[in-house]
Amino acid sequence: MSYKIGFAGTDGRTLLSAVVTSTATSENYGNDFQGVVIRGMPAMPPFAMSMQWPVKFISTADNSKTAYASAIIDALKNGSIDCVVPMPEDLLLDGLLDNLEEVGLSDRVIGFTRKNSFIEGDKIACKHLCHEYNIPVADKWYAVDAGNYEEILRTCLVLLDLYGGAVLKYPYSAGGKGSRIILNSWEIKEVYDTLIKDYGKSYKQRFGKKSQWPLLIESRMSGVEISFIILIDKNGNFQILPTSMDYPERFPGPASKDNPITGGMGSISPHPMETPDLFEMVATDIVTPLIKAMREKNMLRPCLIYPGCFLSFDDHMAPTRIRVCEINIRPPEPEWQPIIRRIRNLGALIKATIEGNLDEVIPEVRSDQISICVALVTGSGGPQSQKGYPWSCTKGELVDIDFAYLKKKKIQVIPSAMTYSSEEGIFKSDGSRVIYCNVNATVTPGKSRAKAAERLRQKILTAFENGKIRVIPRENPQGNRLDFRRDIGNHFDMAEALLPTIV
């Protein structure tokens, strides 16, 4: 009988996780796994059926934590699933695990209790934890009152002088959009005002108008950004999955007030700077002390940790320093997608995380492959002249996909912000990140990963320019509402140019 893994959530990573669990072929750990989507988006069941993906779906009454908990408890009790991986952090932050703990089912969930979800849900508390256990973070960080502009100004000016930049962070859950980078003195007030405008309501809901509003300010870190996903079981065994690199800025170039951090515009795996020495550094400097902290604070349980880091390296590509930017407690979107498309035994790894024997299950990685994920997002325009993702988006427009063409070109399409009209039999956009396009390429040893990445980018660009993936604007039936970053994957080329004799 198949071991059934539920993935609870609504976005693209949720569906792809179920697809990979059901279809990936392991060489060592068996293949009898079934992926199950808990909730998903309305477009996903008909989309999966049209693609003949062997994925099952479990509905929920609504998108609340209570509805998820009810559906998951029923599914675990009736055998529809054997375990569950919550995908969005809000489910854990709102206490999903606590609900399952009340009925004796918490050992079937990967994640933390509401109390211990502070690792992601409270960045200031997480910084204190890292400091206590010598997990490297930014050289300087301060917890200040968001209502005290004079202190914020003074702190930012010092950090600009010493580190060339400062980062303001709303310290609570913000969907990956709570960081604001300041690169010069002129930006301080405008960036501060924008952050307060975006999160003032959230602050008031948490603390009221008269209390202090916690704000995290960090020194800007240099180096390259790199992400890791670590599975940890109840005994403290762990496995580090392949690396990824996120493209969080809306447009190419550094983040700024005009180029905001989004939920993610795309991702690649592996990171161009991935090396065996790097995995050793991560295990020693981050994972081992973090597990020690979890054990000593009675937090150790089946979980998934996702630290975003800054990496420094020498001219031989050897890692010299790594610092944690933040730690998340769920699979990232979209970084999770290219990672799991390179793993043959996702189901076995998740099962081992639940059962406590991760030391016996090694990730089977397609080490000869690179994978690229590109988010197709809602662009500008619409009835109210919307600015497009990540600002304001029009919805309800027809999605037009040439499935035969995309299958021929081996472009995998994952629906995300997409609905389905059963009466009309059509898919419609629902704003934000509508579709993810995933492509993989095998790279022969000694050959250029940059050239392979360029071929993959051209696949997606050609499909887009030829109208093979469209959201049809109401005002222009021949147009395309979708937009995307055309530079996803170019860091393979940049790495080869930087270290031509090594990469």
Residue ranges and their predicted role:
Residues 136-138, 161-168, 182-227, 288-297:
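Conserved ATP-binding module of the ATP-grasp superfamily
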Residues 204-216, 293-308, 358-371, 463-491:
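Flexible, glycine/charged-enriched surface loops at secondary-structure junctions
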Residues 219, 267-270, 374-375, 433-445:
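Short, well-ordered beta-strand elements within core beta-sheets of diverse protein domains
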Residues 428-503:
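Generic C-terminus detector
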Residues 1-112:
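ATP-binding N-terminal substructure of ATP-dependent carboxylate-amine bond-forming enzymes
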Residues 54, 103-179, 202, 377:
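A conserved helix-loop-beta module that forms one wall/lid of the active-site cleft
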Residues 196-199, 211, 221-272, 283-324, ...:
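Phosphate-binding core of ATP-grasp and ATP-grasp-like enzymes
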Residues 280-307, 328-408, 412, 421:
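Active-site "cap" helix and flanking loop/linker of ATP-utilizing ligase/carboxylase catalytic domains
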